[in-house]
């Protein structure tokens, strides 16, 4: 991760600092939402979960070397003083805001190509292939495991460093608007849509709504960007009408095929 001060983090997420007397002197060099991964210099994200609350692990994170905590409330130590923290209304949204700022800082240093991938199937395999391809050209960051949502995408961004040239982002969605949110976060230069299938069709209200959601990626691209579309999938092929970007296509045959 690029080093960033507590003061700049608080500004990026519109948060309130507590327990940090000199925020300009506190430097964060990594971010995690897993207290077991904390190392000296870490920002620990106290994310509330379905079965446990990350705020419970703030003392453990601090003991392991966390220099700052992203929280939704102050957590007090044994003396009654707050652990160093940035307090926000929603830590997940704050992660997204911080990731957006990190991408801006990376691009201010040198050209960084952000490549985003979505599709009902094949995302993880494709991002692994892209990691290998781009990695042969220059320093490349890609998601760990299937980090593709509102938590996983920021965590991927946070692993980028000053020398990163390619940032590969996997994007998943369970609702319309999810991919638009992620694209607003990282501003991809290249967006690849692999296919539109029936996974999560019930949550979306039908396959056509899945196509609408996946197409948010190409809608987010600028005229200077590139959309990469599966020409064998009729719903993906139709997305060329939804983007201002240059369109490249791939496929196995001359005729589009319904999924």
Language-model features: locations:
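Adenine nucleotide phosphate-binding catalytic loops in nucleotide-utilizing enzymes
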Residues: 48, 85, 207-211, 241, ...
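Phosphate-binding loop of NTP-binding sites
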Residues: 94-231, 235-243
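Positions that flank functional sites
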Residues: 76-77, 148, 198, 255
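Short, basic phosphate-binding NTP loop
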Residues: 1-118, 125-136, 158
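General beta-strand structural signal in soluble alpha/beta enzymes
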Residues: 19-20, 70-71, 87-88, 141-144, ...
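Short, polar loop motifs at secondary-structure junctions
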Residues: 70-77, 231-234, 252-254
């Amino acid at each position: 991760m690029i080093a960033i001060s507590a003061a700049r983090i608080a500004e990026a997420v519109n948060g309130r600092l507590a327990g940090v007397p000199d925020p300009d002197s506190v430097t964060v060099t990594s971010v995690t939402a897993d207290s077991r991964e904390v190392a000296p210099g870490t920002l620990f994200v106290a994310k509330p979960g379905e079965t446990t609350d990350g705020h419970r692990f703030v003392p453990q994170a601090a003991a392991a070397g966390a220099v700052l905590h992203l929280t939704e409330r102050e957590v007090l130590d044994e003396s009654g003083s707050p652990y160093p923290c940035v307090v926000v209304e929603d830590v997940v949204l704050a992660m997204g805001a911080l990731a957006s700022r990190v991408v801006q800082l990376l691009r201010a240093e040198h050209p960084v190509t952000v490549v985003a991938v979505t599709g009902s199937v094949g995302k993880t395999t494709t991002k692994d292939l892209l990691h290998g391809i781009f990695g042969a050209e220059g320093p490349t960051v890609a998601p760990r495991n299937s980090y593709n949502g509102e938590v996983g995408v920021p965590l991927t961004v946070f692993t980028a460093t000053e020398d990163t040239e390619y940032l590969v982002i996997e994007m998943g969605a369970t609702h319309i608007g999810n991919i638009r949110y992620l694209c607003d976060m990282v501003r991809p230069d290249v967006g690849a849509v692999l296919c539109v299938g029936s996974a999560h069709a019930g949550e979306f209200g039908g396959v056509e709504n899945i196509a609408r959601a996946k197409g948010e990626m190409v809608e987010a691209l600028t005229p200077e960007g590139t959309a990469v579309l599966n020409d064998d999938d009729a719903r993906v092929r139709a997305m060329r009408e939804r983007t201002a970007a240059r369109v490249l296509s791939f496929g196995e045959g001359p005729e589009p095929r319904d999924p």
